[in-house]
Amino acid sequence: SSSKMRYVYVDINGDHIDELITEPGYGYLTQAIYSYKNRTVKTVAAVGQGTFTKYYPKHKVIYIKNSGHMGYLCDYYYKQSKTGVYKLVAQVGKDYGSRSYDSKPIKTTYYIGNKKTSKAKYSQYIKKMLKGEKGKNFSSLKWKRY
């Protein structure tokens, strides 16, 4: 039945240990990523109102495109910290107001950390962080249901 949760095991951070990604499908928790280390399961990343888009194992980065609702969408970059948890390092806020999402946003705001920045500085930061790594699509993983 369609009420079964989707999940997949994949090594998203290049440490040769698979993480578990689940898709509970709630508005506040669309997808979550769990790691297993020292016999402990830990939530390392979660997304509400959207889905994980790409992961960059070499640079331990996760990208989420178009997360949000009510006319405001964000693109997020998370980088894995020393604790294993992914921390938000950069984001773009796109305000559509009452426009449809296929038109251009009324206003776009760029952030590195929690500081506003220019589009050029944001792009430069992302480029430097990923160093040309192509990234892999979460959508092309072999999802299962249980």
Regions found by a protein language model. Give the residues of each.
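Blade-edge motifs of beta-propeller repeat domains
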Residues: S1-S2, T40-F52, A90
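Beta-propeller blade termini
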Residues: S3-I12, F52-V61
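Extracellular and analogous surface-interaction loops
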Residues: Y9-G14, K79-K82
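Acidic/hydrophobic-patterned starts of short beta strands in beta-sheet-rich repeat architectures
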Residues: N13-P24, H59-I64
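Beta-propeller blade repeat segments, especially FG-GAP/WD-type strand-to-loop junctions
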Residues: T30-A45, Y77-S81
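Acidic, small-residue rich beta-repeat scaffolds with periodic aromatic anchors
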Residues: H59-Y146
